[in-house]
Amino acid sequence: MKYSITLLAALMALGIGCSAQAEDCNANQASMNQCASQDLAALDTELNRQYKAQMSWLKDPARKQALKEAQVKWIAFRDADCLYRVGKAEDSGSIWPLLQSQCLAEHTRVRVKELKAYVACREEGCPR
């Protein structure tokens, strides 16, 4: 019983810490960088989920390969575009991780919407 109360107290403290951390995204540069990185990670998880859903729907191996190639090229474009827009880390200072994560997240949000549209489209004329 004592163990359960200790565990409950620890979990509650952890929850409070996470809540406070979520509210501190504008506290300083490091927290802004961290929050932007977490946002990007969540978007990347959703991107991978949608990509896998579409790949599982496709029956034709050539279509699967085409989507795979498109995704690889999209990632290369996204990364190159953000390098162009944000520049190199050594040229930007402590704000660079925030700007880089925001740029990558902006592109990733758009790509997630595109993949969701593919996944939702199950009619004639949709990629199969």
Which residue stretches match the model-derived regions?
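N-terminal signal peptide c-region/cleavage motif recognized by signal peptidases
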Residues: 15-19
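Cleavable N-terminal signal peptides
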Residues: 9-10, 20
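Bacterial N-terminal signal peptides that target proteins for export
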Residues: 1-8
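N-terminal alpha-helical modules
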Residues: 20-128
